[in-house]
Amino acid sequence: MLGFEAAGTVDAAGPGVTGTSPGDSVTALLLSLGGYAEYAVASTWTGKPESVSWLDAAALPSSAEAAVRVLRQLNVISGETLLLFGGGGSVGIIATQLAVARGITVISAVSEHDEALARELGATPVRYGPGVAGRVGALGAVDAVFDAAGKGVLADAIALAGAPKRVITLSDPAAADFGVTLSEAEPDRAPGALDETMALLADGKLQLRAHQTMPMQQAAEAHRQLETGAVHERIILTLP
């Protein structure tokens, strides 16, 4: 069953589970899927404060976990420059804000549609597409590259970062051919990621990608819309 993430109310807690109890509001990362349902089994979750909407809570887990995980793996520190491909996506938006808050300079390769947003979040936008390496190089040296787009940018990424070890991709299947790490979600690979980002969201210090809603019964239509590539917002499926 599809569904990497979901938000809802705890129905029951398994043996030995601590930190939550029936009736609690939570959002969960579902690495074994199952979010497209009324009930799901979760092992990675965080509480939902009252100040956070259900829609924002549902939109947080997978993107937040990925952003935190890759930034930790890259070990980018204050004063360094991070090049981010896919800065206008749900992962990129969170990664930009986390990096900027840590004193990291972010160059965000985005479409024309997302340039203003990247700038608003504290990044320097560059137009994605042919010639992007030259446009980035004109801004100065790059210390690390976070590829959240997975669209054939690894050769440019390595040239800009200076070595494959400072490049990580979330989804480019050619990663091994370039000696680049393909980062995948696994239990406990980014401990505390949901707690950290939920706290920022509750404090108004984290912005998420814009989203729209559709009823669960229209899940197939939601996927058809996403496959067109023309949807600039996340689609959140809701249950009555």
State the predicted function of each range.
Residues 148-209, 216, 239-240:
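Glycine-rich phosphate-binding loop and adjacent beta-alpha segment
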Residues 20-21, 76, 161:
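Short, well-ordered loop/turn sites that connect or cap secondary structure elements
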Residues 64-128:
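Mid-domain Rossmann-like dinucleotide-binding core that forms the NAD(H)/NADP(H) cofactor-binding site
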Residues 5, 26-86:
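NAD(P)H dinucleotide-binding glycine-rich loop of Rossmann-like/cofactor-binding domains
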Residues 205-209, 223-240:
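C-terminal capping/lid region of NAD(P)-dependent oxidoreductase domains
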Residues 1-32:
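Glycine-rich beta-strand-centered segment in the early N-terminal region that forms part
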Residues 131-140:
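Short amphipathic alpha-helix with an adjacent loop that forms part of the alpha/beta core around
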